[in-house]
Amino acid sequence: MNKKYLPSALILYLNYFIHGVGCSILGQAVIKEALAASWGVEAMAITAISAALGLGRLIALPFAGPLSDKLGRRISTAIGSGSYAIYLIGLALAFNAGTNGGYQIAYVCAIVGGIANSFLDTGIYQAVSEIIYKAPGVATMGIKFFIAIAQMMLPFVLGATVATTVAGLTSYNMLFYICGIAYIVLLVLVMIFPLPDADQKAAGKKEGLIDSLKHTHFSIESVAMILIGFTCTGTFQLWLNCAQNFAKENVGWANPSIMQTYYSAGTMIALVVTALLTRKIKDVRFILIYPVICLVTLIVVLTGKSEALMLAGAFIIGWAGAGGLLQIATSVCNMLFPKIKGTVTALVMIASSLCNYTILTAASKMQPAQVMVMNIVLTAIGVLLGLFVNIRYAKMVEQAEAEN
């Protein structure tokens, strides 16, 4: 790696550090209560704002990648940073708006935040892989680490940024403003600091997703892998956005925000341990083992109802649910479906975004215990899909080798 790109790499990673706050802040019980009080809605209704992030990502997925290839990583990252600033500052303004359209403003801003996520993904994942070209796996793992570190620190940062409005409502606007302004600063830095000039010509000639779908034959196994992108995302997103509400209402825990730290610790440790385990255990085994662990954990948490179990559950779901399972699923797709790996991987990510929107929208209309049951059902479906793929694994490997 050229040392002149070290500051650039740090700037790119810091985008995901703040993203770690932005993508999980609406799942914090204290944030939900503050926003709900300001907007005159139920706390669980705030989950629909989180769902809008998934909708925005879903909207941007078809064109964010091609635009990144055409305009370059710098412009794609700048669009992502600017859009994220709109989302975060928009949340602060929406809080101030109260019942005068605050909820609607936040929903629109969250869609913009989801679009930002897509542009950050297409710009930064490629850019850091081009900077740390000798170890692209380590480069992308760094993104997950920066997200997890931010999420681990979030409960403590919330306590430091709390304020009280004239109306007597608890406000976390300072945090929204700080993160939004930080994204504006990062946008400027991204435009100033050097980035490697990757050859985009070949990428520009790649077949688009729509054209690829027209003549791609999908086997039942490839459909199962796409659906796993939906189920595994649902497992950790429902936990991330709704588990603290379950802890407050069903366990009686007054302030469960520390669960976020345990969740993030599980994710961080999983990134390292899973990377080591995949050297000895086939990747495909994890798309069964990890959902089984999540399923058992969710059942125990639902039936046990204790603070200790909530903390243990947060750590385990962070490990087995959010610690790279989606990335493992895409890796398995690349190996098992060599001729359509780009198409299948894209559809796995679309399924993931679709889950963010549909499942969280549904959760916003439920009670926390009902959300936990829905998560159990969704995870159980993921277990069945993982079992099917593992049973068919040997046959699929033979087919993949024949295609090569």
Predicted segments with their positions:
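Symmetry-related core transmembrane helices of the 12-TM Major Facilitator Superfamily/SLC fold
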Residues: 173-191, 371-390
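A late C-terminal transmembrane helix in Major Facilitator Superfamily
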Residues: 334-368
